Regions:
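Extended, subdomain-level signal for the structured scaffold at the beginning of enzyme domains
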Residues: 1-101, 113-118, 124, 137-147, ...
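Short, hydrophobic beta-strand segments that form beta-sheet elements in well-ordered domains
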Residues: 33-35, 105-109, 126-131
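Cytochrome P450 catalytic-domain "roof"
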Residues: 152
Length: 192
């Protein structure tokens, strides 16, 4: 799948989703937000509504089977958002194909365990972090848990939760662009 896309389902964690979208755009990434529904309106876990760039039908029209390590599929956490993503079969099939084609994947909070670990041994042997309480789900799928704010393992980036959303997004930006771009965006958040 060519490009960078962040996927939204009702119940998404607002801080994780919006911080990631914003930081990637500040870094010059042409990231598109995608609703898994047939309309672009999604509602977060705390009632915030968002209109995505694309709905699922619009994404289907532009999907490519090619992928490179700088093409990312991104999954915010939140419940029941992560569960809703994991239960949407066409998205899970696309994720599996994207990973197999060499594309990058990023997930934060509950999504490493609920979305990624749901694909069986697809991510077995890799190192991830997740929201507290989901560690056993990772380990049951053969995934190595690491307690950290953000973990990068090759073309896989995971984040622990909303308190680490900025670190997570900057890690993705460093993978897609480079560390200098991520550092420049990060520097813009700190007063001199």
């Amino acid at each position: 799948m060519k490009g960078t896309f962040i996927f939204f389902a009702d119940g998404f964690e607002e801080v994780e989703a919006i911080a990631t979208l914003d930081i990637l755009r500040r870094g010059g990434v042409d990231v598109k937000s995608v609703s898994i529904y047939d309309n672009s309106l999604v509602e977060g876990a705390h009632g915030q509504q968002l209109i995505t760039d694309l709905c699922w039908e619009g994404l289907e029209e532009i999907i490519s089977t090619e992928a490179s390590p700088s093409d990312y599929m991104i999954f915010p956490g939140g419940m029941p958002g992560a569960k809703n993503l994991a239960e949407f079969g066409p998205l899970m099939a696309l994720l599996k194909a994207h990973w197999a084609a060499g594309g990058g994947v990023a997930a934060i909070c509950a999504s490493p365990a609920v979305v990624l670990a749901s694909l069986g041994d697809t991510f077995a042997g890799l190192e991830m972090t997740c929201y507290d309480g989901f560690e056993a789900t990772l380990q049951a799928a053969g995934i190595k848990h690491k307690e950290a704010g953000s973990v990068v393992d090759g073309r896989l980036v995971t984040g622990r939760g909303p308190g680490y959303a900025t670190e997570f997004a900057l890690s993705i930006l460093a993978q897609i662009k480079d560390r200098d771009t991520a550092a420049a965006v990060s520097a813009g958040f700190t007063p001199r």
